[in-house]
Swiss-Prot record:
Name assigned to this protein: Deoxyuridine 5'-triphosphate nucleotidohydrolase
Organism: Aquifex aeolicus (strain VF5)
Reactions listed under catalytic activity: dUTP + H2O = dUMP + diphosphate + H(+)
Superkingdom, taxonomy of origin: Bacteria
Coiled coil start-end: none
Key words, A-Z: Hydrolase, Magnesium, Metal-binding, Nucleotide metabolism
Cleaved signal peptide residues: none
Amino acid sequence: MSKVILKIKRLPHAQDLPLPSYATPHSSGLDLRAAIEKPLKIKPFERVLIPTGLILEIPEGYEGQVRPRSGLAWKKGLTVLNAPGTIDADYRGEVKVILVNLGNEEVVIERGERIAQLVIAPVQRVEVVEVEEVSQTQRGEGGFGSTGTK
């Protein structure tokens, strides 16, 4: 397996923050940090856009997936609103994370706090072909819980 290189440009408001890193040897996601000037209060059911201070150069054929951190979701009720957020390989703007507080208490995010995970994943592009009919399956049109919960 060849090594995939992720090039990162750190913006001025993130110069003192660590670069994204894996927390353990087998972590799938790189931790993204809040590049905010001062603590940010997030009220219950409020959403905020948090800068990371990073611009990524994701290799062609890959995407960045911004995912919630399980600890923030469990302990504080915070999650990534559009999870997984997609960062396309040709995007060159600052990476920002949309967080929402689904809890009943106000949450404070501190500068440098780990707020999300970034997973770099391969992308498979497809050719779109319009047809008159699609093949039948045993499942058919069943969806939205049609297979039960047990």
